[in-house]
Amino acid sequence: MLDYTPCEEVTREAVTINPAKTCQPIGAVYAALGVHNCMPHSHGSQGCLSYLRMCLSRHYREAALATTSSFSEGTAVFGVSANLKEALVNLTTIYKPEVIAIHTTCVAETIGDDVGVILEDVEAEELIDPSIKICAASTPSYVGSHITGYDNMVKSFVTTFTKKSKPNGKLNIIPGFVEPGDIREIKRILSIMEISSIVFPDTTDVFGAPLTGEPGMYPKGGTPIGDIEDSANSVGTIALCRMAGGSAAKILEGRYKVPAKIGPTPIGIRNTDRFVMNAAKLANVAIPPELEDERGRLVDMMTDAHPHYHGKKVAIYGDPDILTGLTSLVMEMGMEPVVVLTGTKSSEFEKEVEGLIGPEHPEADVISGGDMFTLHQIIKRKPVDLLIGNTYGKFISRAEDVPLVRVGFPIMDRANLHYFPIMGYAGAARLVERIANTLLDRKDRDAPDWLLETIQ
């Protein structure tokens, strides 16, 4: 398995080997599906949309609803405004959405389609019901990643739909490209703190809705469009992820004077402390004892298990916002990051992670815009005890005989992980348990018969 991966790196400027990211439209579709009765529309070919839906469906084990402009060779050359107009008429007639969220693809961006102008024509020609709300985001696949696409779509929601009116006393939460289980955990924390909130996009009952047997075109979840409109009147905004949702928080602050706190992603003790304190300050509430108890239990867990993971070398890869949180957590656990790699290019990410690791580990590699081939090369030169990341690390895991803790997107070879949080004190506790017990499983596997103990 991967036997011919060389240890020494060769400079590569125009080729990626085994990407550590996916494309912008996937993030845009995921964000759009977090809005109630919203139909994501891919302004591209049927093949583009099939790929997006496949990636989301394989991770979440749920159907990902979306439509397409169905580009062909001819329309790609001569223009596709007629396709988009026909698609909007068809999807409003058949699917009857409240909101349509259009994102572009490589071909649409390459031929220079101006979606905004086409939508003006749709309005002027009265092709669809004017009560249906439409927004559009530019999401070319050859720039950025799924994180960029998510950020662009949420930014489009805010710039298109928000309306200033009277204060609502609520706190905005922009989750980022995170799992439904994480959003549900954040909402639970806010409920304990008795904070009224507007969470958008909210995928908790979209990818993770209960199976009731009741028919329906759209899942019951998602943020109502009225809540997004009302987000301009909130007491503050917390973007859990700097790169996925931070732009929308800045727009709300700049345009409507809604105070914004952007990051850090609440994974681990310190980052969750920051989130809880930011929420308490913006909403002007006290931190309840129940959360203090949760924090105390997490500290107790980490203390109990620390001999099993302290000093262990770890390689982490995935989305940048999740990686900053995971890096903070493993540093709190006393582990040693050898490499932290994301496929999304960002100098801010590199600076933040380097600041978390600090001078204690000057040999650590922090890479943005990297790929899985680079990750493997580094691990071959600097062996690790544990991998933390998505499904695509399993090949490196087998090749180097290193255990893998699956975290992030996509995870297509294990079931139900998206239901459980990694955020908050409860999420960190779950990660601590998984990391410690994965290392203990490896210790048992490698132990000779005379060292196989019932007590660790």
Curated annotation (Swiss-Prot):
Gene Ontology CC annotations of this record: molybdenum-iron nitrogenase complex
Record-linked Pfam families: Oxidored_nitro (PF00148)
EC number(s) on file: 1.18.6.1
Positions that bind [8Fe-7S] cluster: C23, C48, C106, S141
Molecular-function GO terms, alphabetical: ATP binding; iron-sulfur cluster binding; metal ion binding; nitrogenase activity
Cofactor binding remark: Binds 1 [8Fe-7S] cluster per heterodimer.
Keyword set, alphabetical order: ATP-binding, Iron, Iron-sulfur, Metal-binding, Nitrogen fixation, Nucleotide-binding, Oxidoreductase
GO biological process: nitrogen fixation
Cofactor: [8Fe-7S] cluster
Catalyzed chemical reaction(s): N2 + 8 reduced [2Fe-2S]-[ferredoxin] + 16 ATP + 16 H2O = H2 + 8 oxidized [2Fe-2S]-[ferredoxin] + 2 NH4(+) + 16 ADP + 16 phosphate + 6 H(+)
InterPro entries: ChlB/BchB/BchZ, Nase/OxRdtase_comp1, Nase_comp1_CS, Nase_Mo-Fe_CF_bsu
Protein family (similarity comment): Belongs to the NifD/NifK/NifE/NifN family.
Reported function: This molybdenum-iron protein is part of the nitrogenase complex that catalyzes the key enzymatic reactions in nitrogen fixation.
Assembly behavior: Tetramer of two alpha and two beta chains. Forms complex with the iron protein (nitrogenase component 2).
PANTHER family: LIGHT-INDEPENDENT PROTOCHLOROPHYLLIDE REDUCTASE SUBUNIT B
The protein's name in its UniProt record: Nitrogenase molybdenum-iron protein beta chain
